[in-house]
Amino acid sequence: MAVEENNMPVVSQQPQAGEDVISSLSKDSHLSAQSQKYSNDELKAGESGSEGSQSVPIEIPKKPMSEYVTVSLLCLCVAFGGFMFGWDTGTISGFVVQTDFLRRFGMKHKDGTHYLSNVRTGLIVAIFNIGCAFGGIILSKGGDMYGRKKGLSIVVSVYIVGIIIQIASINKWYQYFIGRIISGLGVGGIAVLCPMLISEIAPKHLRGTLVSCYQLMITAGIFLGYCTNYGTKSYSNSVQWRVPLGLCFAWSLFMIGALTLVPESPRYLCEVNKVEDAKRSIAKSNKVSPEDPAVQAELDLIMAGIEAEKLAGNASWGELFSTKTKVFQRLLMGVFVQMFQQLTGNNYFFYYGTVIFKSVGLDDSFETSIVIGVVNFASTFFSLWTVENLGHRKCLLLGAATMMACMVIYASVGVTRLYPHGKSQPSSKGAGNCMIVFTCFYIFCYATTWAPVAWVITAESFPLRVKSKCMALASASNWVWGFLIAFFTPFITSAINFYYGYVFMGCLVAMFFYVFFFVPETKGLSLEEIQELWEEGVLPWKSEGWIPSSRRGNNYDLEDLQHDDKPWYKAMLE
């Protein structure tokens, strides 16, 4: 524990232990002599000072937001990977009802019309998620082997191969199916490496907002995908679906080109002993000189964490299940948060929005999909404020509660009012409009809470040595549940129709309680401070009162944050 207690460059707790660690690290670490001297001087001052005195850590000062335009744009370039995921979500919902797509990859009714069976629809839509799950686990390793930037370029190239196979499909649905698996492999790697790189290059006070830009790009992709489908639906040939797929080449080339401008992760650079490059990366992200003492302090903080992890040996898959280091608890949290993001029911609307709104009697369901896309995209801008100002826990709790209310109304109207004279008769236009309105409310609540925060939590919760593995498994949970929902939704809605909304309502109730008891607040903490929060065993519902060891006073009561004698229901009411 001595090493981890001194992850901060300046430590005012347990001075003797801190001095021993700095001494041991200095033998063959990259901690600067200046920072080692500074740390020892501070420790001695802490020993000789009066009771109640504490040292002040060197931190990179916050600047006006105008100073962070460059790093924000660079993070947006990385976040553009989410656009490719969103583009697929937005376009595939239209493909499955387009005439040329049905003629080429569907089956024929006796009357000569073409259709996709529920099984084939589910497979074509959902298999992408299975590819993503494996891509996140397998291809994300490139981020550890070659660096985050090169790793991203590799997975984008895999995505391009999948798109080529899909475009080349003529009338064999299984060829298109294989292409979706391969493009899914690429997007799965993107979904791990993009949030990871953003979380490692962003200033800590902007990390939540900038990681949320990944979700912003997903929503932009969904919206523009809907718009493109609307623009091509009037064609009668393969332009309907090949043009949207062809545009994927432009997005991929832009992504690869933009990555050349982005700084590499300083944590990765430190891990491969490129310390000077890491210093320049930190300085570029924070708009300060590489010679600034605060940059060196940040570098030393990262190096101390890496040195401690090296002492523990190489990370293995088995270590992910260690309860001693709290990695397993964090992995479970990441898996559950990503699973619950899917069980909110968002992809019920995004994947099958065109089909759903056709069933409520709308003449042009493509137009309604565009409305949903606009609401989703615009709402995500608001999420950039909510993530940092409300905090991560409050966002998740508030989102679960409000989405539950919207889903109850949506399902209840669909079950009781949509077909007042039976399904053989026309649907009620008023009930259909009501369902669309509450669908938009639901999407607003989702886009401002669970959509971005799930990725933020996954990107910042794991130690560096096991980060890619943990993020891959957590993301795989998202993709697997996305597959299950996308594949089984046609069957479930055929059997129970809008009662399906009550299933998601139950999931939203469960996730509210899960977040309250198992997800701590990490807003405004550095990645190393989040590590300390977990190691100290702070109760999630008390985590907002936790202060890192480097900033505590002598009267700080840590034990009160680690225990709670009140019944659970009283803890929730406080």
Curated annotation (Swiss-Prot):
Domain of life where this protein originates: Eukaryota
Keyword Membrane in annotation: yes
Modified positions (Phosphoserine) in chain numbering: S32, S35, S39, S48, S50, S53, S55
Example of a GO MF term: galactose transmembrane transporter activity
Segments traversing the membrane: 71-91, 122-142, 150-170, 176-196, 208-228, 243-263, 343-362, 367-387, 395-415, 436-456, 473-493, 500-520
Chief place where the protein resides: membrane
Stretches in topological domain Cytoplasmic: 1-70, 143-149, 197-207, 264-342, 388-394, 457-472, 521-574
InterPro entries: MFS_dom, MFS_sugar_transport-like, MFS_Sugar_Transporters, MFS_trans_sf, Sugar/inositol_transpt, Sugar_transporter_CS
Keyword annotations of the record: Membrane, Phosphoprotein, Sugar transport, Transmembrane, Transmembrane helix, Transport
Topology term for the membrane: Multi-pass membrane protein
Signal sequence segment: none
One GO CC term on file: cell periphery
GO biological process, alphabetically ordered: carbohydrate transport; galactose metabolic process; galactose transmembrane transport
SUPFAM superfamilies in alphabetical order: MFS general substrate transporter
Gene3D superfamilies: MFS general substrate transporter like domains (1.20.1250.20)
Chain spans, region Disordered: 1-57
Compartments (UniProt record): Membrane
Compositionally biased region (Polar residues): 23-38
Family the UniProt entry places it in: Belongs to the major facilitator superfamily. Sugar transporter (TC 2.A.1.1) family.
PANTHER family cross-referenced by the UniProt entry: GALACTOSE TRANSPORTER-RELATED, PLASTIDIC GLUCOSE TRANSPORTER 4
Purpose of the protein: GAL2 is a facilitated diffusion transporter required for both the high-affinity galactokinase-dependent and low-affinity galactokinase-independent galactose transport processes.
Identification of the protein by name: Galactose transporter
Organism: Saccharomyces cerevisiae (strain ATCC 204508 / S288c)
